[in-house]
Amino acid sequence: MTPCSVANRFLLTTCAVWIAGGTLFAQPQNPASPPAVPPVERLGENRLRIGHIQVDVAAREVAVTGQVNDVQFLEWVANTAGGLKAYESAITADTDAITFNTALLLIGLDKAHARVPTQHFDPVPPRGDPAELWIEWGEAPQRKRVRIEQLLLNKRTNTTLPEGPWVYTGSTFLADGRYMAELDGVLIGFVHSPAPIIENPGAGAVGAFGSIVWNKELLAPGTTVNLIVKALPVQ
């Protein structure tokens, strides 16, 4: 058995345990239930699909389709399909929070390394396994791929968000068992909040709250995109 096969089996097992545990413990104490996690489908030796998310285990990348929201100011990079925070989020991803988190587990991101913010605008930076965020759009041969930071503008300084690794925090479960990322409908944020699954550890993003806007000149609202998360080696 190859090392990659062993890794694949380990990741699938980890994913299955998380799904089972998350489904068990994420049951709220009201009639509303969390979304059912789609089955993990194998597309090739190192390629998987879960719902609308493509997973490349070898490259340690996940990609999910979405649409650019037409909003004024940003607090979140990506929200869930039908998520409550779409009015202040850059991209509506075609997935729910539980499925998105499951896909990230499949590329080896580990919540055991995370320091999750304990409040909105937490002054203590979040920590976690590092990742890069990329956006793809258009058709070949004009298809473009840029880092997400190039699309997030600080209106005060007229500069883009500084490039650097984002971190996997995994969100958090509330006392009643509900998964906060699913409850709030947020996947990726930059204001040091306990809700999103991926956060920006930089202080500059929090300090620029209220001034971060989408670069509409580079990528217009309504555009269909691929949101890509690439896991990086843990230092």
Regions found by a protein language model. Name each.
Residues 1-8:
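N-terminal secretory signal peptides that target proteins for export/translocation
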Residues 11-22:
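Bacterial N-terminal signal peptides
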Residues 22-23, 70:
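Hydrophobic alpha-helical segments
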Residues 31-32:
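Plant-biased recognition of short, low-complexity, intrinsically disordered N-terminal tails
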Residues 35-235:
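Long, low-hydrophobicity ectodomains and other hydrophilic envelope-associated domains
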